[in-house]
Amino acid sequence: MLFRSSAYDIKYITGVELNISFSHPRYRNSKPVSLDMLGYQYDIHNQELIKKLKQVSEYRRKRAEQILEKINDELTKEHLKAFTHQDLEAIEETVDGAFGRPHIANYMVKKGIVSNKQKAFDKYLVKCNVPKMPVSLEEASKLIRGAGGKLVHAHPSDPNGTSLVSLTPSIHEQHKIIKESMLPWLDGIECWHTRHNPETISAHLAFAKKEGLLVTGGSDCHQQPIIMGTLDIPAYVAEQFNL
């Protein structure tokens, strides 16, 4: 991809998504929640970042195996056929990017175990979940900044995703959390997102301007039904990266 970009004189920004574990003393009795962070414009040859991403990738596969083992326990109780190693390999063949529960859900639909992805989560994947590899906000920031990049808080108000909504639905409270506990490690905030409404976008833009943060946006297109390129993001967002 980078070679083709250079060959056709296309400007690009390197990017990676990192999942972190975050807790706040005022919410959920300090129980940690999962949040997504975005690293932009980093050196893809940075060895520390490469090493960590490899560890995360290897952990994801082990996590998937553990989730399937738990699902097998449930399937056995229901007198249904358990997943095999061949099933795991078949799921892996469908993965384009990071291996996660949505890929298992899709496979369960394909095998006729459930009628749709949501039922896969409701009946099996929530109950059989295994925690993701714990990475702190500080560690993620040091990795990305150490590679010359910028760390951005992904979709902070996504009602359906790994976001601050897990702590509070109030955007005002979300901004308070960011200001109190996250600002030293953040360079920006993702304002435009498929599940951010106009009011949410405006609130995040105002907050970012006040705190001197970069503003970014993305469709969060990991798979269907979300389509890449369907979100209208101003050109000045890319210009912030001095391309």
Regions of interest found by a model, annotated:
Residues 122, 153-156, 187-191:
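Short beta-strands and strand-loop turn motifs
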Residues 1, 129-133, 159-169, 192-200:
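Acidic-and-aromatic substrate-binding clefts and catalytic sites of carbohydrate-active enzymes
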Residues 1-96, 184, 190-234:
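A metal-dependent hydrolase metal-coordination microenvironment
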Residues 68-143:
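Hydrophobic, aromatic-enriched interface-forming segments
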Residues 133-179:
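Conserved, well-ordered alpha-helix/loop/beta-strand core segments that scaffold catalytic motifs
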Residues 39-41, 108, 155:
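Short, structured patches in soluble enzyme cores that scaffold and shape functional sites
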Residues 172-190, 230-243:
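Structural recognition of alpha->loop->beta junctions
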